A protein has these predicted regions:
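Extracellular low-complexity, O-glycosylation-prone stalks/linkers
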Residues: 1-125
Length: 125
């Protein structure tokens, strides 16, 4: 095999941001907080997911407010909320390439306690 030159071949595997998280839901709401949960994106884009970005928006406003960009779990409690305001939430996954598309709640939720103090007291009868 003399006279044959071997050269290394480099293969680049393209990576993309992850797809949107799935099944975003508000599992608990109070007058000043909302507990969110979601499931992992269908695809990580070829690079492990490093964290999630959580945003909120008061429906009376146009712009989104970033709540946290370093969420590591598949749940997060958003605080503070203004009692009596309607909110929508969204979550995006991030990997080494960047932030993917957001998964957004379809319906707004009202920031209020689930049970009033009177209802709590009557429940003990």
């Amino acid at each position: 095999m003399t006279g044959i030159l071997w050269e290394p071949i480099f293969v680049l595997i393209p990576s993309d941001p992850p797809t949107a998280p799935r099944w975003l839901d508000v599992v608990n709401i109070s007058r000043n907080s909302a507990e969110l949960k979601w499931t992992v994106p269908e695809r990580d884009g070829g690079s492990p997911i490093t964290n999630y970005v959580v945003e909120k928006r008061d429906v009376r406003r146009k712009g989104w407010q970033t709540v946290d960009t370093t969420v590591k779990e598949l749940k997060y409690t958003v605080t503070p909320l203004n009692e009596g305001s309607l909110y929508v939430f969204r979550v995006a996954a991030e990997n080494a390439v960047g932030v993917g598309p957001f998964c957004e709640l379809e319906d707004s939720v009202l920031a209020k306690d689930t049970f009033s103090e009177l209802e709590k007291n009557l429940g003990g009868l």
